[in-house]
């Protein structure tokens, strides 16, 4: 499918800017506002995904390495959504051009290297001007500031660990769901998507309790709050109704550096259909 070129017709007005570096986020955000753009800030990938769906901006600028969801996954989900897939995306990152080969789902339309803030901002403006003049089909003129950025071995190592982690999750049971401390879905296995009857892009960012039967929502919410408020690894079992299925689950807290950073739901089976008369 060829990318459409909305920017040739309509100038950029609203922008979602995503970066976990607070100083960069606020500085670039203010500079963009000084050019009369309507700027919405996201501090992590999950927040960026929510803003893109809620606002449907005319352009998105995002870092690659971010908490909760990396920029590559955000890009991939945008391109999977029929209502969002033509959104112009500018990657703004300290990664090198060679590092990007480790992110095959990073389907951005322009790439701007981080660096001295004034120069980086000018390059962002150039990338936006290029996209508005040439459309999404011409990426060559939208690669800016990478002449002196060197690849880093740690990026490849980080990606290997992420893939290994994803493979471990897929091996844990028929379906697995990783949550943040607010109970929102960060990662979900293909098996869990199939069991729940919804796609990954529909589920990422959703509160897991919203997928449960009404009678189980408060119980699961209380369970998650208990697990994520502790400083020790905890595990418990429950049976929860998702749609028409009753599914036995294990819920485990995820600890990092002595604090809970989220929870993992492991579906122990594909469940059984609830008797409507029961």
How would you describe each model-predicted region?
Residues 55-61:
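Active-site beta3 strand of CheY-like receiver
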Residues 43-47, 58, 70-76:
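Acidic catalytic/metal-coordinating carboxylates
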Residues 73, 85, 95-127:
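Alpha4 helix (beta4-alpha4-beta5 surface) of REC/receiver domains from two-component response regulators
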Residues 21-43, 47:
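Two-component/phosphorelay signaling modules centered on CheY-like receiver
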Residues 156-196, 201:
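Sensory modules in modular signal-transduction proteins
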Residues 212-243:
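Terminal output helix/cap of sensory domains in signal transduction proteins
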Residues 123-126, 130-173:
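CheY-like receiver
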Residues 66:
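Receiver (REC) domain active-site loop signature in two-component systems and cognate sites
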């Amino acid at each position: 499918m060829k990318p459409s070129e909305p920017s040739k017709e309509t100038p950029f007005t609203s922008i979602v800017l995503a970066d976990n570096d607070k100083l960069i986020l606020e500085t670039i955000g203010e500079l963009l506002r000084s050019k009369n753009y309507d700027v919405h800030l996201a501090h992590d990938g999950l927040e960026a995904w929510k803003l893109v769906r809620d606002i449907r901006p005319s352009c998105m600028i995002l870092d690659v390495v971010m908490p909760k969801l990396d920029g590559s996954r955000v890009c991939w989900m945008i391109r999977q959504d029929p209502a969002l897939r033509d959104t112009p995306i500018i990657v703004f990152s300290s990664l090198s051009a060679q590092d990007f080969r480790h992110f095959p789902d990073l389907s951005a339309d322009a790439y701007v290297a981080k660096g001295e803030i004034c120069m980086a901002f000018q390059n962002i403006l150039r990338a936006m001007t290029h996209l508005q003049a040439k459309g999404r089909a011409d990426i060559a003129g939208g690669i800016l500031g990478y002449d002196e950025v060197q690849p880093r071995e740690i990026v490849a190592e980080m990606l290997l660990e992420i893939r290994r982690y994803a493979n471990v999750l897929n091996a844990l049971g028929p379906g697995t769901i990783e949550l943040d401390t607010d109970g929102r879905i960060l990662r979900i296995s293909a098996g869990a998507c199939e069991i729940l009857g919804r796609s990954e892009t529909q589920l990422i960012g959703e509160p897991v309790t919203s997928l449960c039967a009404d009678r189980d929502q408060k119980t699961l919410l209380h369970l998650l709050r208990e697990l994520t408020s502790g400083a020790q690894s905890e595990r418990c079992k429950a049976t929860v109704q998702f749609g028409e299925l009753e599914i036995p689950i294990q819920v485990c807290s995820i600890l990092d550096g002595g604090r809970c950073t989220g929870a993992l739901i492991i579906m122990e089976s594909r469940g059984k259909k609830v008797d409507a008369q029961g």
